[in-house]
């Protein structure tokens, strides 16, 4: 048997899948369901309050058996155990990836470098809860003594996408006494529009940056600070209107924030895995400490399911392995995430970072090039039914094979006439249409003119999974996020990539730091970029003007 360091394509388990692919590829989902009417019940799994129907994927029970064999050959059980134990599974940075510790219950022992980290996690959670209650109750006031009416989270990447997504997803559970806004883009428009109609005396900024040096975040924070002081006129006001989510006490002090209002997290928490750490302070203020505990409980339930359930009935393992099958073997290199719940409108954007920053890698963990197969798929999507009137045309009749993840809930949070039945009817209909399509004969039988038959024919055989839960809530959201976290990890093990680093974001940062000096230079700088970049810089400098109307 090949060990984990062998190139993927040489493993017997992979070769068995390639042989199996040749047998399965010609089969249409129509044929698979005709042969096996009970397929819809058997190719499904349940855990942590989520139900996964993967019967409309282009797999058979033999496919799943072979994928599980591949996972075992690639060492998934051992790598999973290593992650839960706090071993340094982030090889290139020499760190643990211990987001599961963020939702571990009190009393559980999880060690990093010989130190139990669970007490520290709960110490931070307790401080967050006390602060959140102060803000929610009005006990925490601004510099002038007025209560806080708006919380603005300032961050980027994992310090923004998770909290922003969670706020929108849990809007039905949030306090309506306080408004929440999120600023991430270094484009000044983002901050300007976020604060345009706010009262500085009633605004609290949460500045989320582990190092407190992140370019975009600290640029926005400095401008927010200037906006506040322009109105309140006293440096002491900063300490009542700014809170830090950081580990750099010196920089936090220098900014004017009281270190007592600094909430930390750890190197073993990656940004895209941090929404249930102190990065989630805005979420806790919005839904309350009780709601945040429910969120953590949902994460924990899926953690335990991933850790304990057999791989063939393990939701994250199945989602991850089928994703490998689709992207690396079947040729479906893009995944449309289609939540049929408006509250999840930012969930696809959140998954873009989680999946693509984690597994968008061209070398293995040991630095060898990935050859002969793809790695991370491209994730995107929109809530239903909006997407049906946008890009579903391509899903049904385009030349690209797109795998789809439908997400829906049996009960709505906003009962309104027949809205929810119509919504869910569309979800089920789209999965059915993608799988089975419409033949030319069926189109003709409907009376379609012959010239239009090719246009009214749907090939079908487009793979999709459907995830159902009873109702969207904090616990359900936690389980859903953890499902994809662990699916990403599963794929990383199969592809042998480091799912916890992100070196691909560094080069652009370095070049931007160089270019901004050239843009801000008072005299025309000597440029040494390529011809295109030089020309763009010169044109920008010549035409930027000095006002919004230039």
Curated annotation (Swiss-Prot):
InterPro entries: G6P_Isomerase (IPR001672), G6P_Isomerase_C (IPR023096), Phosphoglucose_isomerase_CS (IPR018189), SIS_dom_sf (IPR046348), SIS_PGI_1 (IPR035476), SIS_PGI_2 (IPR035482). Keywords: Cytoplasm, Gluconeogenesis, Glycolysis, Isomerase. It comes from the Bacteria. It is found in: Cytoplasm. The keyword Isomerase applies. Pfam families: PGI. This is Glucose-6-phosphate isomerase.
């Amino acid at each position: 048997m090949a060990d984990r360091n062998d190139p993927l394509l040489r493993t017997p388990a992979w070769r068995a899948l390639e042989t199996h692919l040749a047998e399965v590829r010609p089969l249409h989902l129509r044929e698979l369901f005709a042969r096996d009417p009970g397929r819809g019940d058997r190719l499904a799994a349940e855990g942590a309050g989520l139900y996964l129907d993967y019967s409309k994927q282009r797999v058979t029970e033999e496919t799943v058996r072979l994928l599980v064999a591949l996972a075992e050959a690639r060492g998934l059980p051992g790598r999973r155990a290593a992650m839960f134990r706090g071993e340094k599974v982030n090889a290139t940075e020499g760190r643990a990836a211990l987001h599961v510790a963020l939702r571990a219950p009190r009393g559980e022992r999880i060690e990093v470098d010989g130190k139990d980290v669970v007490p520290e996690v709960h110490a931070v959670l307790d401080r967050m809860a006390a602060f959140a209650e102060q803000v929610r109750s009005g006990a925490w006031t601004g510099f002038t003594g007025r209560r806080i009416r708006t919380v603005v989270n300032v961050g980027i990447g994992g310090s923004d996408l998770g909290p922003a997504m969670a706020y929108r997803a849990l809007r039905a559970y949030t306090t309506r006494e306080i408004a929440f806004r999120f600023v991430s883009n270094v484009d000044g428009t983002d901050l300007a529009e976020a604060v345009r109609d706010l009262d500085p005396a009633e605004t609290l900024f949460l500045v989320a940056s582990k190092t407190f040096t992140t370019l975009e975040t600290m640029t926005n924070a400095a401008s927010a600070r200037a906006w506040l002081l322009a109105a309140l006129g006293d440096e002491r006001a900063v300490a009542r209107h700014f809170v830090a989510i950081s580990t750099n006490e010196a920089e936090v002090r220098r900014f004017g924030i009281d270190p007592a209002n600094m909430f930390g997290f750890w190197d073993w928490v990656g940004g895209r895995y941090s929404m249930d750490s102190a990065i989630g302070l805005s979420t806790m203020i919005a839904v309350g400490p009780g709601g945040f505990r429910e969120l953590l409980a949902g994460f924990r339930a899926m953690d335990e399911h991933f850790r304990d359930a057999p791989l063939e009935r393990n939701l994250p393992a199945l989602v991850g392995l089928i994703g490998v099958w689709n992207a690396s073997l079947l040729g479906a290199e893009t995944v449309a995430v289609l939540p049929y719940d408006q509250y999840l409108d930012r969930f696809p954007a959140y998954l873009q970072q989680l999946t693509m920053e984690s597994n968008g890698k061209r070398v293995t963990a040991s630095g060898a090039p990935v050859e002969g197969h793809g790695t991370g798929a491209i994730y995107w999507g929109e809530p239903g039914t909006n997407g049906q009137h946008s890009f579903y045309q391509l899903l049904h009749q385009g030349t690209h094979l797109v795998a789809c993840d439908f997400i829906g809930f049996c009960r709505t949070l906003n009962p309104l006439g027949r809205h929810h039945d119509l919504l869910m009817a569309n979800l089920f209909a789209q999965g059915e249409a993608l799988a089975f399509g419409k033949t030319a004969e069926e189109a003709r039988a409907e009376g379609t003119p012959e010239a239009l038959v090719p246009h009214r024919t749907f090939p079908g055989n487009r793979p999709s999974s459907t995830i159902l839960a009873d109702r969207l809530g904090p616990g359900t959201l936690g389980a859903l996020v953890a499902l994809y976290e662990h699916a990403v990890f599963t794929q990383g093990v199969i592809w042998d990539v480091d799912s916890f680093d992100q070196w691909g974001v560094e080069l652009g940062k370095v070049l931007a730091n160089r270019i901004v000096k050239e843009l801000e230079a008072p005299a025309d700088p000597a440029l040494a970029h390529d011809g295109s970049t030089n020309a763009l810089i010169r044109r920008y400098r010549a035409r930027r003007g000095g006002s919004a109307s230039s």
